[in-house]
Amino acid sequence: MTHPVPDTGPASENMAPHRLRARPLGLFLPQQQPAVVMRTDCYICRSEGLAARSQVLIQAGGREILASLLHSSGEMIAPGEIGLSESAAAALGVAPGDAVSVRHAPPIDSFGALRGRVYGNRLDGAAFRSIVDDIVAGRYSDVHLSAFVTACSAFPLDHAETVALTGAMVASGERLAWGSDVVVDKHSVGGLPGNRTTPIVVAIVAALGLIMPKTSSRAITSPAGTADTMETLAPVNLDVGAIRRVVDHEGGCIVWGGAVSLSPADDIIIGVERVLDLDAAGQLVASVLSKKLAAGATHLVVDMPIGPTAKVRSPADAAALSGALQKVAAEFGLILKVMQGDGREPIGRGIGPALEARDILAVLEGRDPPPDLARRACELAGALIELAGRASPGTGAALAAQVLADGSAWSKFQRICEAQGGMRTPPLSNHRHVMTAQRPGRVSAIDNRRLAKLAKLAGAPAAKSAGLEMHVRLGSAVETGTPLLTVHAESQGELAYALAYAEAVGPILELSDR
């Protein structure tokens, strides 16, 4: 039901002060940030001094949100109307024509502490809780968020601050409990294409009776996140009740973390970090550990690939990050082990949701599996098994390989998929192009970042079947015409776009003389 509001100004006897008619615009902003659009000649903007990019309080039907204000001087918005972004309209639950009230947003109490941090002051737990609460409540605009991320990067968080931020992020959302002294989890630091070990690890450890409720992310800058890949095999958008049912029946799940409110501030902060290309160690540690603690983990293995084009580029960087993770985890009673690995090249053959899913199936079914993916999955699963006390030190990987070989992991994975809503077959691409060696030689270097960009230009992860299929590895000997990789796309245009990039960017795989 709509509530019409006249187009006239404040003198109209039928119009309550500061009320306008809602007009949903279908406008999407980064991080689903709520925004409203008002005319530059709107009497409310003039009387209240509402400038563009101001934070405003919007109320309708008992609901309220904070939103960023945009101005329009054209005919997009009629007199007496207010345009609403998609997230703003959804949060308010309004239909076209519904009455909406507008006023100045209240002051942000936590911003004083943040200003102090910009000038080098350390923050305590209360300050971080106040900041994180304001972030989750939507009181921080993208400008405020950028200031927070920059302040914590230019002047890095110390140990006490990292602990405080981690605790504040955990407290900002739901926290799951599983009624068990041992709940295992795994995290990959990232930066390596493919490397889709998580579904295999979950299947192995759940087959051994361990509890592993895995909440995973979608891709932000990569060709696929675990949730994107898993979605080609089974539904992943499960609420907390559904997650509990799956885990109660099967001991594990692989679901999208965005469907549940675990450390919600983390998702918001990560989005800003990506735009600013900032990835400070303290915030990374708080991000990883807050999600795992909120998910109820007691034992965690961190996969940390090291390589010149991976996220962690040197042994020194790996040692520093590993130490920080260990120290902060200990403050929360989380038992953690870091597994460093070779990050010089992709793991597995596929890069992109469906292609990575096919690698997972090949490993679980024992059907021509990529050896490196099977090996790394068993190493990580073995570390979790040992950490949980189910195997003596040095024997976990062999036990994981046995569970993989005898079909127990494959059977468990199928049951998890069915419990999540039914198993699916990953789609096949419509268009493919094989890139071949232009001369004889040996593969001496692989640029992970360029591979990831090539896969994204081909359409991944939005196009589930798009991406790359690797045919060679570091050290492979090739002749002229030897297939190096196949580009997969769902449309001819996306394929052409990806190939144009590959031709322009220079070598993605470098060949040396034999």
Curated annotation (Swiss-Prot):
SMART domains: PYNP_C. It is an enzyme of class 2 (transferase). One of its GO terms (molecular function) is 1,4-alpha-oligoglucan phosphorylase activity. PROSITE patterns: THYMID_PHOSPHORYLASE (PS00647). Keywords: Glycosyltransferase, Transferase. Its EC number is 2.4.2.4. GO terms for cellular component: cytosol. GO terms for biological process: pyrimidine nucleobase metabolic process; pyrimidine nucleoside metabolic process. It comes from the Bacteria. It catalyses: thymidine + phosphate = 2-deoxy-alpha-D-ribose 1-phosphate + thymine. PANTHER family: THYMIDINE PHOSPHORYLASE (PTHR10515:SF0). Belongs to the thymidine/pyrimidine-nucleoside phosphorylase family. Type 2 subfamily. HAMAP family: Thymid_phosp_2. This is Putative thymidine phosphorylase. It comes from Sphingopyxis alaskensis (strain DSM 13593 / LMG 18877 / RB2256) (Sphingomonas alaskensis).
